[in-house]
From Swiss-Prot:
Keywords: Hydrolase, Metal-binding, Metalloprotease, Protease, Zinc. It comes from Burkholderia pseudomallei (strain 668). Residues 1-64 are annotated as: Disordered. This is UPF0758 protein BURPS668_0979. SUPFAM superfamilies: JAB1/MPN domain (SSF102712), RuvA domain 2-like (SSF47781).
Amino acid sequence: MQYEIVSAGEDVDDERARGRRAAAPAAPSSAVPSSAALSSAALSSAARPTGAPPATAAARRGRDLPRERLLARGPAALSDAELVALLLGSGLPGHDVFALAHTLLARFGSLRALLDAAPDDFKGLRGIGPARTAILVAVVELARRALAEKARERPLVDSPGAVDDYLRLLIGTRPREVFVCLFLDARHRLVQTEETAHGSLTRMAVYPREIVRRALALNAAALIVAHNHPSGAVRPSAADRRLTRVLRDALALVDIKLIDHFVVGASDTFSFAQAGWI
């Protein structure tokens, strides 16, 4: 990863029923239906609402099964596709909701990539309109906010696992480089999280002076910074180490401590502090 460290002067056919009742021989008008026929007709009628095709009722029962299992056994009992299907609610003509969920997961490659997708990423996808896009984006934002609340409850230095989870959800699967700052108070509790720089796959301009200025404006006593590697490899580069030194020294001039710098991938993180590099 290369940095530009910038100084102050640079700125669902719901499946259609295909079965057809076999034509019964015509009975004389005086014929009385047998008790077996009456029982069969009663059971068939009770099996579905009046006017509903048999396949529609079956599809409805199929959608209900994951919901019932979730309520009875918890969300861990469901597959990724089943959980996505519950969010989507219904399918398309020719494709039930579970087929749509599988299609989405295949399109994005993983559940994490699906949930980290931006609204524009869903444009043109059959069956995913504005309402479903909003639901998928909102779910991830709720998770981020919940983790941020957790980070505010106690000092982040006492809960490194919470920091890892938060950062991976925040930037771990971004397709481009993002530099993020976690501004902390004197007790090392989270005050605010801000994305302070965005780059390409291999290069990003970072402004240490602007980060210091923002820390002073928020009355922060300490900082944790992080950036992602879209490749997934979290080993820091020489440029990563140089940036960390420059930022640490700039913050020290105004008595603000740089606690850690994380390099973040989709499934792993690297901590400068744990490596003894800060």
